[in-house]
Amino acid sequence: MFSSQHRLLYQPSGPDLSKNLDPERGRRLGIDVGSVRIGVAFSDPDGILATPVETVRRYRSAKHLRRLAELVVELQVVEVVVGLPWTLTDRTGSSAKDAIDTAEALARRVAPVPVRLVDERLTTVSAQRLLRAAGVRAKDQRAVIDQAAAVVILQNWLDQCRAATPARADEPTTGSVAGEVIDG
């Protein structure tokens, strides 16, 4: 089901840096696979912030896969993160199969860039809340909800990677406790 031949990796509980599977510095691409549209987001080269890129329309042909592969090249992506929609009861359905099939097809096109499947539970709900908080009316959300969901998927992954990566000795730190006020 999950092929390693094309560097398709399934990581249900976040990054496993012990196996050194994570690429170095560079942009990441986040993908929210839907039945009609695919939301796309990308990160800055340092992997700190996810930003929406575009919504790619799905086609019966491979036209959408071609566009996703083009984005990997255009944006010089070092890793692709595809949301895998699990249910709250840890089950998968047709949406998950669709995400897996899309990720496998994309992995074949962009090898050796790794394509990872990551848990995307409740990302659309989170994206809707973020858009509502930003003042986007419900009727206007449809045009950007897929991109917003891709941002949530990618940002969650970036945050997990940062949390799993020990601080390097050459990185400057404040030496302060989180939440502590620092005088300039």
Curated annotation (Swiss-Prot):
CDD domains: YqgF (cd16964). GO terms for biological process: rRNA 5'-end processing. It is an enzyme of class 3 (hydrolase). This is Putative pre-16S rRNA nuclease. NCBIfam families: RNAse_H_YqgF. Residues 1-23 are annotated as: Disordered. Could be a nuclease involved in processing of the 5'-end of pre-16S rRNA. GO terms for molecular function: nuclease activity. Disulfide bonds: none annotated. It is found in: Cytoplasm. Belongs to the YqgF nuclease family. Keywords: Cytoplasm, Hydrolase, Nuclease, Ribosome biogenesis.
